Amino acid sequence: MPELPEVEVVRRGLQSHAVGAAIEAVEVLHPRAIRRHILGSEDLIGQLTGQTIASAERRGKYLWLVLEPAGVGLVVHLGMSGQMLVQPPTVDWEKHLRIRLALDSGADLRFVDQRTFGGWSISPLVEVDGTMLPESVAHIARDPMDAAFDLESVVKVLRGKHTEIKRAILDQTVVSGIGNIYADESLWRAKIHGNRIAESLTRPKLRELLTAAHSVMGEALDQGGTSFDALYVNVNGESGYFDRSLSAYGQENLPCPRCGAPIKREKFMNRSSFSCPRCQPTPRARRIA
């Protein structure tokens, strides 16, 4: 699933190429693409047609378009393979095109999703801490790239967590935007093993970790995000290249860029964790009461 940098790349593209355009027509080409919109395709088409895309917004890994004058959010779930592409209408339809918007700018806004895990839904906007969010996103915490991110408050929350630190920073209600890739990269930079218990870490160490998350995601954003295959692209269909700069994630048996020890892979939930056994020693006590 795309993480914060990849979603932000898409958001910026939509802000540049779709915002300000009115929606003239809507085609829903696959029912799974709107399964989260429980009122169905006719309702979604009716709510979208005639609306203007006022802005493209993001919180963590969640993306939405603000529509006016209705004042609602079109929530875009990218899933594992979702793409938002701005195309001239003369370009042939993509094989896995699921939804197409015809804009008054003369362009198409196309939702392409090979694996059909993603989709669109319309949600009312609600105010949370001075920010308007789709109701379905209201429970999501601010992310480290958010100008209003309160580092000390998050440190305090993490200090109260009796769980592995990696699991804690993947909790989108604590801090959003961090997924498996950037969790491993941030933990590597802060020299923390993901199995360390959050409450056992000092406040300075937690600040270091969250600062590392901000830095690594900022660097990834500058490089267009991380693309392991052709499915993670921006609105112009271009892939990012931060995967070439990864220090830990996916680097099993390669030398740690800091100390030279081979990076190791461990099972974590239904995924994998990558870390340096020398820079990030495994904690002695891993059990949680």
Curated annotation (Swiss-Prot):
It catalyses: Hydrolysis of DNA containing ring-opened 7-methylguanine residues, releasing 2,6-diamino-4-hydroxy-5-(N-methyl)formamidopyrimidine; 2'-deoxyribonucleotide-(2'-deoxyribose 5'-phosphate)-2'-deoxyribonucleotide-DNA = a 3'-end 2'-deoxyribonucleotide-(2,3-dehydro-2,3-deoxyribose 5'-phosphate)-DNA + a 5'-end 5'-phospho-2'-deoxyribonucleoside-DNA + H(+). A zinc finger (FPG-type) spans 247-281. It comes from Rhodococcus erythropolis (strain PR4 / NBRC 100887). This is Formamidopyrimidine-DNA glycosylase. The gene is mutM. One of its GO terms (molecular function) is zinc ion binding. Binds 1 zinc ion per subunit. One of its GO terms (biological process) is base-excision repair. InterPro entries: DNA_glyclase/AP_lyase_DNA-bd (IPR015886), Formamido-pyr_DNA_Glyclase (IPR020629), FPG_cat (IPR012319), MutM-like_N-ter (IPR035937), Ribosomal_uS13-like_H2TH (IPR010979), Znf_DNA_glyclase/AP_lyase (IPR000214), Znf_FPG/IleRS (IPR010663).
